[in-house]
Amino acid sequence: MTHSTLRIRQARHTDAAALEQLASLDSSHAPAGDVLIAEVGDELWAALSLDDGHAVADPLRPSADAVLMLGAHGRQLRREERRRAHGRPRLRFA
């Protein structure tokens, strides 16, 4: 039995056709804007738009956990972006 690793990464423009195909499998439209994808090996299992939260997943694969992981990773990325934008919080002493 082989074990494959789920990998999360930012979508690239070269992923457009695969995102459209995944959305078609999920009877939906492809996520737009900043998109994270979850892939196992060379197969795209799920994708999530960081802009509006729209997700698609391969219904023929056990992809529910992949969608949850994309959401958690996306929230972490957004928190880090907000921290960088606002600088480090300062400690205040009473």
Q: What are these model-derived regions, one by one?
A:
Residues T2, V40, R90-F93:
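Amphipathic alpha-helical "stalk" segments
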Residues D34-A46:
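Conserved beta-hairpin
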Residues L50-A94:
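Acyl-donor binding region in acyl/amide transferases
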Residues T14-A17, E43-A46, D51-D52:
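Soluble, non-transmembrane catalytic domains of enzymes that act on hydrophobic metabolites at membranes
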Residues M1-H29, R84:
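Short amphipathic alpha-helix that is part of the acyltransferase structural core
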Residues D26-P31, E39, H73-R79:
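Charged, low-complexity, helix-prone segments enriched in Lys/Glu/Asp/Gln
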Residues S24-V35, A55-P62:
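N-terminal low-complexity, charged segments
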